[in-house]
């Protein structure tokens, strides 16, 4: 049984971790922290978890207690894991970080996008980017795993087959992405109010979103060279979901794109390449650790359109974190994650 600690259990990714781990036959959450809710029973904050975590209460983060865990998840704002990850690693505890703290390899680049100096640059070299479809073998041997962001997950999985095969013009890629409101987090903000988001949709951060350097970093690895990417995120009136519409120009029109995608993801338990001509819906992955993909070449031209959908809280965050845990501890990768999406 893997003993699990969670730092930051009161946000959406924290409660999603609790929900998923409640169904995991080989994991036990033994400590969950929140400075603001210390002493409050988990079931009192989250009634949906009644009967699953009886006796477990939020506590103030304590290195000794957390260090007794096999693995600690950080479901915290950026900067928090910087301060604690090193001490936990020194105690022999594995760290899986859902924040952006260790996703970028360049500390200066991180500081540029997150507006503060990187707090643990000495750990960047050993941090493994936790996209299992790319780094599965590195994840198996890791001590510190950086779980990819939601937009980067959907976007990279959509572009990877094209770039790895070298059949797309990597200098001109476009990612037009839509997100549900839960992607903004649980904190109170005017822009997330029901009356502000319902029956409306808008683009934001067109000048540059924090996920842009992360996406570029991953696509650069796949292409083996620098990439040109235009990334435009949108806020949509739904709670969960990411829908990425991705555009690329093919340089070899002889390639069977459907076969290319099917072959690339044939052995991936959480990537579903849909039949040719399909249009995946975000509702089909709600609550599931799945990326559902369809590839199109309109009018048999040079432009490829890839449609990629995920649940931003599951495959885009907590589900992918549990997937990483399974790999890290030599468990069946699908353990605790095989449930279907919720319809309607």
Curated annotation (Swiss-Prot):
Active site (UniProt): 150
SMART domains per UniProt: Semialdhyde_dh
Stored Pfam families: Semialdhyde_dh, Semialdhyde_dhC_1
Catalytic activities: N-acetyl-L-glutamate 5-semialdehyde + phosphate + NADP(+) = N-acetyl-L-glutamyl 5-phosphate + NADPH + H(+)
Biological role: Catalyzes the NADPH-dependent reduction of N-acetyl-5-glutamyl phosphate to yield N-acetyl-L-glutamate 5-semialdehyde.
NCBIfam families named in the record: argC
Protein name: N-acetyl-gamma-glutamyl-phosphate reductase
Species, as recorded: Pseudomonas fluorescens (strain Pf0-1)
Taxonomic lineage of the native organism: Bacteria, Pseudomonadati, Pseudomonadota, Gammaproteobacteria, Pseudomonadales
Gene (UniProt): argC
């Amino acid at each position: 049984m893997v003993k699990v600690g969670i730092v930051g259990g009161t946000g959406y990714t924290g409660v999603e971790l609790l929900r998923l781990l409640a169904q995991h036959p080989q994991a036990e959450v033994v400590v969950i922290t929140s400075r603001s809710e210390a002493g409050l029973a988990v079931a009192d904050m989250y009634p949906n978890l009644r009967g699953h975590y009886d006796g477990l209460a939020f506590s103030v983060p304590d290195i000794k207690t957390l260090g007794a865990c096999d693995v600690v998840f950080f479901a915290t704002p950026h900067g928090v894991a910087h301060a604690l990850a090193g001490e936990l690693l020194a105690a022999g505890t594995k760290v899986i970080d859902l924040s952006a703290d260790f996703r970028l390899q360049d500390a200066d680049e991180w500081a540029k996008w997150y507006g503060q100096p990187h707090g643990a640059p000495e750990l960047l070299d050993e941090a493994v980017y936790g996209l299992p479809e790319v780094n599965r073998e590195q994840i198996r041997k890791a001590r510190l795993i950086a779980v990819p962001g939601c937009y980067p997950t959907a976007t990279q999985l959509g572009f990877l087959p094209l770039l790895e095969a070298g059949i797309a013009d990597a200098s001109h890629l476009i990612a037009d992405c839509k997100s549900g409101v839960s992607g903004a987090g649980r904190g109170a903000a005017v822009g997330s109010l029901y009356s502000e988001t319902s029956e409306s949709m808008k683009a934001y951060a067109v000048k540059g979103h924090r996920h842009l350097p992360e996406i570029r970093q991953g696509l650069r690895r796949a292409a083996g060279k620098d990439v040109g990417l235009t990334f435009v995120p949108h806020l949509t009136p739904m709670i969960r979901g990411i829908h990425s519409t991705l555009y690329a120009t093919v340089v070899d029109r002889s390639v069977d794109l459907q076969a290319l995608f099917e072959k690339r993801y044939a052995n991936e338990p959480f990537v579903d390449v849909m039949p040719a001509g399909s249009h995946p819906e975000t509702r089909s992955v709600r609550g599931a650790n799945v990326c559902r993909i369809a590839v199109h070449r309109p009018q048999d031209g040079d432009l490829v359109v890839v449609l990629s959908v995920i649940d931003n809280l599951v495959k885009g965050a907590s589900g992918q974190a549990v997937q990483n845990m399974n790999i890290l501890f030599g468990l069946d990768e699908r353990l605790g994650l095989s449930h279907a999406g919720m319809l309607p």
